[in-house]
A protein has these predicted regions:
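Alpha-helical scaffold domains
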Residues: 1-224
């Protein structure tokens, strides 16, 4: 066991481990230590200032789920965009679950929209489930507000997949698009442009959202 792994096991919460493992059926429970996210985030902040952190980021793949989450948190702290994107590209193929994939994006992405948009398009076109999901997450987080264009919805909505975690992200994206860009997103529901499963899940998520008005929710229920 490495020194880092020993430190992570000191932060273990076995009750949390049992609960969180049940939410990730594709991840071996033996690969989950059981460190709560706020605790791991505090650890990452201190760990990022050590030489051990730089070495750790070169040692892929990692053994534990928490090591992968720690890696993502370390990437998110990198302020230099070129270095950040380089580390992101190296790590994305190693993501093996939705929870690691959906951790907050690096803040420097927000200041480099032109480049990150092109990379998001490439990631969405990837064959790998979580690289594809990550690209969709970028579009959802960074391109549904002031930088939105109608054609961006098609980038995500146009993806056809049999993968549960890809389809779930499409639905999450569509529900968010309905909340933020109703006029551009609603035709995809009205005209049933999505697969049946994604269509229904998008409506479900939108109806559950506090950002959708009661009138919009009633209208969406009629489109099920």
């Amino acid at each position: 066991m490495t020194h880092l792994q020993e430190e992570l096991f000191k932060l273990q919460d076995t009750v949390y481990r049992n609960f969180h493992s049940s939410l990730m059926p594709g991840v071996d429970k033996e690969a989950v230590i059981g460190v709560r996210t706020p605790v791991l985030r505090a650890f990452a902040k201190k760990f990022s200032k050590t030489e051990e952190a730089e070495q750790f980021m070169t040692e892929l793949p990692h053994k534990y789920y928490e090591e992968n989450n720690l890696h993502m948190m370390l990437i998110a702290q990198i302020k230099d965009y070129d270095k950040c994107i380089s580390e992101t590209e190296k790590f994305l193929p190693h993501i093996d679950n939705w929870a690691t994939c959906d951790l907050p994006l690096p803040k420097c992405f927000d200041k480099n929209k032109e480049d990150i948009l092109e990379r998001a398009k490439k990631w969405i076109a990837a064959d790998t489930t979580y690289v594809k999901r990550y690209g969709m997450g970028v579009m959802m987080s960074l391109f549904l507000d002031e930088d939105f264009k109608e054609e961006y919805i098609q980038l995500v909505a146009g993806v056809k997949s049999e993968e549960y975690y890809v389809n779930m992200m499409i639905a999450w994206y569509m529900a968010t698009a309905l909340a933020k860009q109703w006029d551009a997103a609603i035709p995809y529901i009205q005209e049933r442009r999505l697969s049946e499963w994604v269509h229904r899940k998008s409506i479900q998520k939108a109806v559950e959202s506090y950002r959708i008005t009661p009138e919009q929710k009633e209208y969406l229920k009629g489109l099920r």
